[in-house]
Amino acid sequence: MEKILVINPGSTSTKIAVYEDDRQLFVNSIEHADEEIEKYDAIYDQYEFRKKLVLEELEKNGVKASELTCVMSRGGLLPPVPAGAIRVNQDMCDQLRLHPVNEHASNLGAPIAFSIAEENDIPAFIYDPVTVDEMIQLAKYTGIPEMRRRSLGHNLNMRAMAHRYAADSGKKFEDVTVITVHMGGGTTVGVYQNGKIIDIINDEEGPFSPERAGGLPAPQVIDIAFSGEYDIKALKKKL
């Protein structure tokens, strides 16, 4: 029997669940107040804080870390990777700590999972991280030769929903074409065809959402950038 800890660190919450095979033992979402998160200068500074919450949640629900057989986590902003499960190692954790593609709370997932797994001599995995890249080349072109669109999105949720749609329709995942939309702190839109996400509108170029400005008129962005009111860090935070 497998006992699996699942961790999903998001911008405003840390979601935790434990499964015995496919039976859910418990699930909880710990919401983080703005003033709590704003104590930390960098996202990775939240590592100890969030790991402590995960371990406390296990204890609260009567689950010993030593009983676990695997730790699964939401993946962070790694370089482009294929869809599916990827085993976590120290190199991955170092990449997310020192050279993430972008700053996001999901970068904490693999290091927390790896730490708990190492302490209990079990494997840790991430699944469908936000940097899954299966986009066709045509979808990466923009109106400026020096710029290319990037494959970034909420793949964990969108791919799961595409799989669920296929199953509910009595079809194979590889045989459906489906548009998926993730609506959370950021909104991403993807299209799946033949089992791959061939195009994606990430949360910085599509609809605005509670934590993202979304696609904006380029001339106005340029005006704000050169207004002298913002440095690059402040402007990125505003967007």
Label each residue range with its predicted role.
Residues 21-24, 84-95, 116-122, 141-144, ...:
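A glycine- and small-aliphatic-rich helix-loop capping segment at beta-alpha/alpha-beta transitions
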Residues 27-66, 92, 96-101:
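N-terminal phosphate-binding loop and adjacent alpha-helix
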Residues 58-105, 123, 131-142:
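Short beta-strand-loop/turn "lid" adjacent to the catalytic site in phosphate-handling enzymes
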Residues 70-73, 123-129, 179-181, 191, ...:
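General beta-strand structural signal in soluble alpha/beta enzymes
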Residues 108-115, 126, 141, 146-177, ...:
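Glycine-rich phosphate-binding loop plus the immediately following alpha-helix
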